[in-house]
């Protein structure tokens, strides 16, 4: 939900320019899921969904650092995070009646960061609006012994016209922040859960398993047995992002429901395994962002152990 709010904040400030795409030699990743012609699309009517509000006192997840023996081996069926994989989702948001091109590049690095005694996988995320980089982010995930993928925090830098604007970081264990669950090992329809708690920056996202067994097609492929998770936050409980997850891939589509002013829609257009050189480039970007974090987030990020 935070990316959605970021677009609403920064889009009016951004100067548009034309971007020429660079050629890539990354290897496309194929999965064992056969293409299908969808018999029924997911039901995403623009009406509020009945998502239980997460009580900040009673509904936070029970995080146990001792339950993470092999935490960086994230092989969750719906949210695998293999180092060197990259997902690119492309689409649009709406702002003042205008359709704004939007693209997110999600790259799993081979870096590790220890948070609350747990070794986490570092993901490097780039968020583009009209071709401009409006956010770069370090995100931290770990898988517990039961196969659940946890979210232990993030360091996002927000930009407008190429200049730093803000860095609303939250990391579990600091300033009241607590880890949440990104993806259950066995999602059950109707189950809701906190995705993290960062009160210092009003990060209160939660998810609810909205639908199971769906079929959907995106530019890259068609997928069956897709699950749909409705995500919202305590501050925006009438606005939902609908995130579609395919087996062996992860997030393949994003839609919206309710009072979402930006009406963000995204579809998977690239799913690749980076070359060693490409992964090294992303690693350098992550280290550079960490150096910036030490400057801009002295009370949060600077209090953590460095990337490994």
Task: Give, region by region, the residue ranges found by the protein language model.
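Bacterial N-terminal signal peptides that target proteins for export
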Residues: 1-11
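C-terminal motif of bacterial Sec signal peptides marking the signal peptidase cleavage site
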Residues: 18-21
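Bacterial signal peptide processing site
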Residues: 23-26
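Conserved functional acidic sites
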Residues: 36-37, 42-308
